Swiss-Prot record:
InterPro entries tied to this protein: T_IF-3_C_sf (IPR036788), T_IF-3_N_sf (IPR036787), Translation_initiation_fac3_CS (IPR019813), Translation_initiation_fac_3 (IPR001288), Translation_initiation_fac_3_C (IPR019815), Translation_initiation_fac_3_N (IPR019814)
The protein's name in its UniProt record: Translation initiation factor IF-3
Family: Belongs to the IF-3 family.
GO molecular function: ribosome binding; translation initiation factor activity
Domain of life per record: Bacteria
Species annotation: Shewanella oneidensis (strain ATCC 700550 / JCM 31522 / CIP 106686 / LMG 19005 / NCIMB 14063 / MR-1)
Alphabetical keyword list: Cytoplasm, Initiation factor, Protein biosynthesis
A single BP term in Gene Ontology: ribosome disassembly
Its job: IF-3 binds to the 30S ribosomal subunit and shifts the equilibrium between 70S ribosomes and their 50S and 30S subunits in favor of the free subunits, thus enhancing the availability of 30S subunits on which protein synthesis initiation begins.
Cellular compartments annotated: Cytoplasm
GO CC annotation, single: cytosol
Quaternary data: Monomer.
């Protein structure tokens, strides 16, 4: 969320200290979260000044509005820090692609299979593209057999998200990692 700036000063998402106007009294919460009760706005500001922290309006729509005595700078910092942590914990799932041909040799097949296993263990989806050239289009059953072999070899690592289907001269299958 971007905070608007007015004359060099940022407008906070919550009203603080003298910005809280138009209400005669507020429901006040102390620094440690203890409920102080309903007090006049002036008394609440005096208590915040004595503690050397800010009076922050938490819930402006309540009757009377709820305010808390807290260090507002620290509050914003903690809020930004927790938002950053949340963003860091989110993992972007990528789709990794491996290309096969109907005549892929056994050694090449094993290397590509190891790469597929690595992608799936990292939590990424795997897109397997089987490309047909020239007269290979007449033997699509060989390609489908290869895709079925890949599917059975990766049974313990992946589930098939989209089954093999032909798109032009390619057969495509998408695998998703199994949930642990």
């Amino acid at each position: 969320m971007k905070i608007k700036k007015t004359a060099g000063r940022q407008l906070a998402p919550n009203r603080i200290n003298e910005e809280i106007t138009g209400v005669p009294e507020v429901r006040l919460t102390g620094i440690d979260g203890e409920a102080i009760g309903v007090v006049s706005i002036r008394d609440a500001q005096n208590l915040a000044d004595e503690a050397g922290v800010d009076l922050v309006e938490i819930s402006p729509n309540a009757e009377p509005p709820v305010c808390r005595i807290m260090d507002y700078g620290k509050f914003l910092f903690d809020k930004a820090k927790s938002a950053k942590e949340q963003k860091k914990k989110q993992k972007q799932v990528q789709v990794k692609e491996i290309k096969f041909r109907p005549g892929t040799d056994e050694n090449d097949y094993q290397v590509k299979l190891r790469n597929l296993i690595r992608f799936l263990e990292d939590g990424d989806k795997a897109k397997i593209t089987l490309r047909f050239r020239g007269r290979e289009m007449a033997h699509q059953n060989l390609g489908m057999d290869l895709l079925n072999r890949i599917k059975t070899d990766l049974d313990e690592y992946a589930v098939v998200e989209s089954f093999p289907k032909m798109e032009g001269r390619q057969a495509i299958m998408v695998l998703a990692p199994k949930k642990k």
